[in-house]
Amino acid sequence: MSINGNAAASKLYISDVTLRDGSHAIRHQYSVPQVRQIALALDEARVDSIEVAHGDGLQGSSFNYGFGAHTDVEWIEAVADVVKHAKIATLLLPGIGTVHDLQAAYNAGARIVRVATHCTEADVSRQHIELARKLDMDTVGFLMMSHMSSPQALAEQAKLMESYGATCCYVVDSGGAMNMNDVRDRVLALREVLQPETAIGIHAHHNLSLGVANSIVAVEAGAIRVDASLAGMGAGAGNAPLEVFIAAAERMGWQHGTDLYRLMDAADDIVRPLQDRPVRVDRETLALGYAGVYSSFLRHAEAAGHKYGLKTVDILVELGKRRMVGGQEDMIVDVALDLAQQTTT
């Protein structure tokens, strides 16, 4: 098997997101001991990086997105205390987190930052990417909801991030809405316009049960960094399950550098028991992928459905029709109120 025409000797970069995207699955309530335990297990399994933050990135703890059990800095410091191999990553959404928050995360131990914008708004990432480069951080551009942009338009946005200083750009399937052709086309489009030394990453969600398949196709098209989480812990139906992707990569003959059995143990013994709502494809999470809705809307939509006596699926489908994107969580209640009014008239 080859990776984008190169020998399979190309080692994949395994980026774990259990302690960031996975935070959505438990409404950002990781305790410090839990964070340490998960980080230690991941480090012992030799993943390349461990992303740590509120589910919505630095300073995501808020009324709009949900308050975290701890601050981002507390979580990052907890991971820094135990990891010996993996680099600590964090996520920053311009407009939620600031350059000051990025500096604080760096001081706490983060050495990688993924600067995340909606797939058409890369221009708002400039000052954050430039600061990250000044701090000598591994600087990544993260284009959320990539399914809402054509491959060529997405590539243009990635090129902007590269021009600001990003050394890696991600195709991000925030809604778990893409199929394998969608992913392949976008990765190939990025590879065509980015400099050869600029890496490409894939961040998949499992809402259509395609998280692992999409990650494999992305690697075949030229992606080298792969996001995944233990037991798929993440928003919606979760991310590509890390232990499943690694098993598949092993079968493909790809080098990944991790310990599959340690990952399997960590997924089942440590992470899965934390889920107060099973992270799986079900009626509600399938609706996310089918309607192309931001995966972290799930728990908010469930709460609104319960409050206003509505089906969560109806709320999610309407959000998809209105093309709501990450950062518009406040509109979930507006949509619920509109639907509730329609049922009474």
Curated annotation (Swiss-Prot):
Q: Which UniProt keywords apply?
A: Aromatic hydrocarbons catabolism, Lyase, Manganese, Metal-binding
Q: Name one GO molecular function term.
A: 4-hydroxy-2-oxovalerate aldolase activity
Catalysed reaction(s) here are: (S)-4-hydroxy-2-oxopentanoate = acetaldehyde + pyruvate
Q: What is its EC number?
A: 4.1.3.39
Note one Pfam family from the annotation: DmpG_comm
- Indicate which residues the UniProt annotation says bind Mn(2+): 21, 203, 205
SUPFAM superfamilies associated with the record: Aldolase, post-HMGL domain-like
Which residues of the sequence carry a binding annotation for substrate? 20-21, 174, 203, 294
Report the top EC class in one word: lyase
What sequence ranges are listed for the domain Pyruvate carboxyltransferase?
12-264
Would the keyword Cytoplasm be found if you checked this record's keyword annotation?
Answer: no
Q: Which domain of life is it from?
A: Bacteria
Similarity field: Belongs to the 4-hydroxy-2-oxovalerate aldolase family.
The record's annotation in PANTHER family points to: 2-ISOPROPYLMALATE SYNTHASE 1, CHLOROPLASTIC-RELATED, HOMOCITRATE SYNTHASE-RELATED
Name recorded for this polypeptide: 4-hydroxy-2-oxovalerate aldolase 2
